[in-house]
Amino acid sequence: MIKRVNWLEIKVTDIKKAINFYRDVLGLKIKNEWPNYAIFDLAGTLVLAIMTGGKKGQKEGAPNVYMAVDNVDEEYEKLKAKGVNFVEPPKKQYWGGYATLFADPDENLFYLTQTKD
């Protein structure tokens, strides 16, 4: 039986640019780094790895990745001020949540979502 998803890899075109985005812009803690690969810890629950070999642009069939935050509107404003490319402003989602959609430098898409704990 599958217990949980614990590792997520995202392909990027420029590892240094991607590390800067995920570490310095999004504030993720880097665990390890190699010339073509880097690993970030997401609150001890999931590992996000970035690796070279990607092509720019959203890939058909790519999974949606949701990152939970305490306040979507606050994070939206902070990240927007840092130049993050938001595809969709914060809004109520059809599934009942509240979220915003942004892209990394390689146009991989991510949601910031606010949930009730």
Outline where the language-model segments fall.
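N-terminal beta-strand motif that seeds the catalytic metal site of vicinal oxygen chelate
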Residues: 1-17, 63-65, 116-117
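Conserved catalytic-core motifs of GNAT/GCN5-like acyltransferases
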Residues: 9, 29-34, 91-93
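Amphipathic alpha-helical segments
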Residues: 16-29
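Short amphipathic alpha-helices within nucleic acid-binding modules
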Residues: 21, 73-78
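Conserved short beta-strand elements that form part of the metal-binding/catalytic scaffold
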Residues: 29-62, 109-114
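Short beta-strand micro-motifs in enzyme catalytic cores
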Residues: 38, 63, 96-100
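Vicinal oxygen chelate
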Residues: 76, 80-117
